[in-house]
Amino acid sequence: MDLKLCETITNAFGPSGFENEVAAAVQAALPAGSQRDAMQNVYAPFAPLSGKSVVLLDAHLDEVGFMVQSITANGLVPLGGWVEHNVPAHIFQIRTRKGGMVRAVTASKPPHFMSAAERQAPLSMDSILLDAGVSSREQALALGIEPGCPAAPEVAFSYNEATGFAL
């Protein structure tokens, strides 16, 4: 297994609809003549070996992510679309329109600011936000964060040689 290639592809930013970086990493690892279409599908024809089977490798390039839909007055970005319990305390990358990346952490109302009823209620996606360290909508916009920007969890490839397990 080529662990460096696995690391490059794993660490590439690629939420659904924004797979360009992952597709470029895959294409760079393939022989000359590979092609990429407008939908970021990567094609790499290989000459069949005489008498050998031909195999088609078909895989998704995208990862689960979010799309910025709005920014609150205090610069936070509301999230939606995931199972609530998988989201808290994650670091995310938000890709700006100009291609830059802004790190943000998922945040929700701290327990010491919650009422007793709020502390007892199940976590809801409406209460989870991305905090990029700004204090206003204007500051978020100045960083390049705006509706339509994709966001995905920040990942770092890791490999456990003892178990052969890669993350």
Predicted regions: what they are:
Residues M1-L167:
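N-terminal hydrophobic/helix-forming segments and targeting peptides
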